[in-house]
């Protein structure tokens, strides 16, 4: 009997930090394939690892989603659910995961062609939701999230084999340049940074609030920032930022009076379904990394 050895294109969580050139396309669809993203915007996405839409959803739609977000984070049953992340210091609900299963309102947003159509075009196939959540960053001291590549975690802990995954962050409040907005290093998606250190069991319980395993070193981040620069994203409610799964990104604290909230949806190609983790002892729970690969229709 022989045991098949699984290829790992992106090694991480070993004894030392290491870089690997990207082995996968950024845009998976054929040139000229139909879809809502213009050719020049696809070129920008391929080059920078992100694209922005100034007004993906209209103000009246924003109001509906904002009301649903407020309903969910105010619901004691949702707050007590393991899918909700409550900040220890403030006791504020910061995130609610698997929101497309909890709420039919957000399930409808996932199915909206303005949303899922862009994912299909970028990934060149049908897609399923690997992860969804609503995020709330209150004013007056809400903590940010340190620099990381989502793919590093999704590969190491969820078993996504290839970089065929795209995220969208849809703003439900205005994103100023002062209230802890999303930052991305343009072009960083072309290099995979494998992080040092083993993955603890049940690492997700800590990492959803403060990333530790899978965190790049200061030296590596400095080199990447010097090479690529840093882009801070601002925009009105209803704007959206699409970004590649391997883009190095993070966000700062929000010490302003102005809260931020968004909907975050991760689409993965049905041809890139999750396997066993590449660098973790156990799978993360399904509400963080889906095992239902049913295409969004």
Swiss-Prot record:
Cofactor(s) the protein requires to work: Fe(2+)
Cofactor binding, per record: Binds 1 Fe(2+) ion.
Gene3D superfamilies associated with the record: q2cbj1_9rhob like domain
The keyword Iron is annotated on this UniProt entry: yes
UniProt GO MF annotations: 2-oxoglutarate-dependent dioxygenase activity; iron ion binding
Protein's GO biological process: ectoine catabolic process
InterPro entries referenced in this protein's UniProt entry, alphabetically: EctD (IPR012774), Phytyl_CoA_dOase-like (IPR008775)
Domain of life assignment: Bacteria
Record site: Important for ectoine stabilization: 154
Catalytic function, reaction form: L-ectoine + 2-oxoglutarate + O2 = 5-hydroxyectoine + succinate + CO2
The protein's enzyme class: oxidoreductase
Enzyme Commission number(s): 1.14.11.55
Keywords for this protein: Dioxygenase, Iron, Metal-binding, Oxidoreductase
Binding site for 2-oxoglutarate: 137
Similarity comment: family membership: Belongs to the PhyH family. EctD subfamily.
Subunit composition and interactions: Homodimer.
Protein's UniProt name: Ectoine dioxygenase
Lineage per the UniProt record: Bacteria, Bacillati, Actinomycetota, Actinomycetes, Kitasatosporales
Encoding gene, per UniProt annotation: ectD
């Amino acid at each position: 009997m022989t045991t098949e050895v699984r290829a790992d294109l992106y090694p991480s969580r070993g004894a030392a930090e290491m870089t690997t050139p990207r082995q996968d396309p950024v845009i998976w669809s054929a040139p000229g394939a139909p879809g809502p993203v213009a050719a020049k915007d696809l070129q920008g996405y391929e080059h920078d690892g992100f694209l922005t839409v100034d007004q993906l959803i209209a103000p009246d739609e924003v109001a509906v989603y904002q009301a649903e977000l407020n309903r969910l984070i105010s619901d004691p049953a949702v707050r007590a659910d393991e899918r909700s992340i409550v900040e220890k210091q403030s006791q504020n609900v910061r995130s609610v995961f698997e929101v497309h299963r909890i709420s039919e309102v957000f399930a409808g947003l996932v199915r909206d062609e303005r949303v899922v159509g862009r994912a299909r075009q970028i990934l060149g196939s049908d897609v399923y939701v690997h992860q969804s959540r609503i995020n709330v960053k209150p004013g007056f001291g809400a903590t940010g999230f340190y620099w990381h590549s989502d793919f590093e975690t999704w590969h190491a802990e969820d078993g996504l084999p290839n970089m065929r995954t795209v995220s969208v962050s849809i703003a439900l409040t205005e994103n100023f340049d002062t209230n802890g907005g999303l930052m991305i290093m343009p072009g960083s998606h072309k290099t995979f940074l494998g992080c040092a250190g083993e993955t603890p069991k049940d690492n997700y319980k800590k990492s959803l609030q403060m990333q530790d395993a899978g965190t790049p070193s200061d030296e590596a981040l400095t080199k990447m920032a010097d090479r690529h620069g840093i882009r801070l994203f601002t925009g009105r409610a209803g704007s959206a930022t699409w970004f590649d799964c391997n883009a190095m990104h993070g966000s700062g604290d929000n010490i302003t009076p102005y809260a931020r909230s968004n909907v975050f949806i991760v689409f993965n190609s049905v041809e890139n379904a999750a396997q066993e983790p590449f660098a973790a002892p156990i799978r993360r729970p399904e509400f963080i990394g889906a095992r239902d690969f049913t295409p969004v229709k």
